[in-house]
Amino acid sequence: MVDPIVTKNWRDLIKPRGLVVDQDSLSNTYGKFVAEPLERGFGITLGNSLRRVLLSSLQGAAITSVKVEGVEHEFMTIPEVAEDVTDIILNLKEVLLQIHTNDVKTIRIEADGPKEIKAGDLITDAQVEVLNPGHHILTISEGGRVRAEMTARRGRGYVPAERNKVPGSPIGTIPIDALFSPIRKVNYQVTNARVGQQTDYDKLTLEVWTDGSVAPADAVAFAAKIVKEQLSIFINFDEAEEPAEEIKPVEEQKLNENLFRSVDELELSVRSANCLQNANIKTIGDLVQKTEAEMLKTKNFGRKSLKEIKEILAEMGLSLGMKLENWPPKAAPQGAPKV
């Protein structure tokens, strides 16, 4: 056990009051986060570390190969198709996917002209979600016909086409460069923060742009977790935990009366309502104890459903990931809606 005097090396350092999220600009592809105050120099240390991990280490999904009927290599053309194979491959690289499994998935195009094929026309299964369905892929003229099969999987960072070659693949299979990272851009800025009369502390402002397959707040959390896990091997001691603050007993806390309402009263879309029913979530109290990650594991539950539920809960002063001890209570508070 480490000497309590030594623990002052880290316990006496200034820590941020919390992570502030700019709600006015927050979207499913952009987030602005502020952490302050930090000890001088920690703004650059944390900002640079998070930026590098965000750009290099988060997993995403991408198409890794394509095989088009009648095409042997990428420099050929397809009869009655406006784009040549090279252009089609470039368009396929920009298809944004979310894959809810670690398995390699097969995606198909089966179409006859005249028709414009967009990302939303790709034939997938329930585990593959296309995030930019309006993205153009190719155009088939009258009398044209396209039959194509693609593979897609989850991965990390950038993987060149050469590494996406699979031994034994059918002749005509064309490997594709894959950019798996869901992060499009990361900026950070370090300015001065005030603590009392001192202004020589750091304020870290972090901006994150994603492709929509991961929420910016989740991306930052995942990156921080990666950094924490990597650094943990350098700690060669155990320490006594700091005395816990006295917590007000749950019985004395006034519960939000909305917690006792049925989820049927939320006026959700049919898809979202069915997902909650299949997950056996009956009350709002049951719902708020679920984390975003747990909800996204629910069958057919996607980002749109998540956003819908979060917005409705926010109007009630509630959120996902809440901790409700001894739920459900033996008796609902007076005046609470009956389920």
From Swiss-Prot:
GO cellular component: cytoplasm; DNA-directed RNA polymerase complex
Region (Alpha C-terminal domain (alpha-CTD)) residue spans: 250-339
Function: DNA-dependent RNA polymerase catalyzes the transcription of DNA into RNA using the four ribonucleoside triphosphates as substrates.
Database matches in HAMAP family: RNApol_bact_RpoA
InterPro entries for the chain: DNA-dir_RNA_pol_insert, DNA-dir_RNA_pol_RpoA/D/Rpb3, DNA-dir_RpoA, RBP11-like, RNAP_asu_C, RNApol_insert_sf
Family statement drawn from the similarity comment of this UniProt entry: Belongs to the RNA polymerase alpha chain family.
Gene behind this protein: rpoA
Stretch list, region Alpha N-terminal domain (alpha-NTD): 1-238
GO molecular function, one term: protein dimerization activity
Superkingdom of source: Bacteria
BP GO annotations: DNA-templated transcription
Annotated domain remarks: The N-terminal domain is essential for RNAP assembly and basal transcription, whereas the C-terminal domain is involved in interaction with transcriptional regulators and with upstream promoter elements.
Signal peptide segment: none
Enzyme class: transferase
Documented EC number(s): 2.7.7.6
Presence of keyword Transcription: yes
Self-association state and partner proteins as the record states: Homodimer. The RNAP catalytic core consists of 2 alpha, 1 beta, 1 beta' and 1 omega subunit. When a sigma factor is associated with the core the holoenzyme is formed, which can initiate transcription.
Protein name: DNA-directed RNA polymerase subunit alpha
Catalysis: reaction(s): RNA(n) + a ribonucleoside 5'-triphosphate = RNA(n+1) + diphosphate
Entry keywords, A to Z: DNA-directed RNA polymerase, Nucleotidyltransferase, Transcription, Transferase
S-S bonds: none
